[in-house]
């Protein structure tokens, strides 16, 4: 919730026309996000934070594409990925032609965000730097992102910036 609120502060709350949307798998974080919205005077009808797995059970399918997406997904977590062949037909992942490996979901989160992004929108996703250099399917997904000019820029961040991890991170900005 704090990342959504920070984005609204930068954009100006008056520019958040449709409201705040999100999805969180961790029930504690989900509840904290909702509480944070109330504590910052966001009316209940101005946010829709769903509980569930973003990659295997995405919410907000019926909503229009988003003009701004911010995300700080968990770094290098496991997911069904290439262990579930049906996911290659998912419209979020199919364009790249391959799935992120089941041992590392980083690029699956990036493809998910890209699929929800409006044509003139911008997404900023905090990532583990490994997404820049790992091979195999991840290299093919990166190539897809580059070939289609989706990557606007990459911002390298210092280590010890985020609570709970000492690793350096980066922000991938998609357009």
Q: What positions do the PLM features span?
A:
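Conserved S-adenosyl-L-methionine
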Residues: 1-71, 76-78, 83-85, 93, ...
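Catalytic core segments in nucleotide and nucleic-acid processing enzymes
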Residues: 86-90, 100-103
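Generic signal for short, ordered secondary-structure residues
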Residues: 91-92, 124
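Conserved adenylate-forming
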Residues: 96
């Amino acid at each position: 919730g704090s990342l959504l609120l920070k984005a609204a502060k930068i954009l100006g709350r008056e520019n958040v026309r449709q409201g705040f949307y999100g999805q969180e798998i961790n029930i504690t974080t989900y509840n904290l996000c909702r509480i944070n919205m109330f504590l910052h005077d966001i009316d209940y009808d101005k946010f829709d934070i769903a509980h569930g797995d973003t990659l295997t059970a995405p919410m907000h399918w019926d909503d229009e594409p988003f003009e701004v997406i911010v995300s700080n997904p968990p770094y290098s977590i496991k997911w069904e990925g290439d262990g579930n062949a049906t996911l290659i037909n998912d419209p979020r992942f199919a364009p790249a032609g391959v799935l992120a490996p089941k041992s590392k979901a980083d690029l699956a989160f990036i493809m998910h965000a890209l699929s929800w992004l409006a044509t003139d929108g911008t997404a900023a996703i905090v990532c583990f730097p490994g997404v820049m250099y790992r091979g195999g399917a991840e290299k093919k997904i990166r190539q897809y992102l580059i070939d289609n000019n989706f990557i606007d820029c990459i911002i390298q961040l210092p280590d010890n910036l985020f609570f709970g991890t000492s690793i350096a991170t980066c922000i991938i900005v998609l357009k």
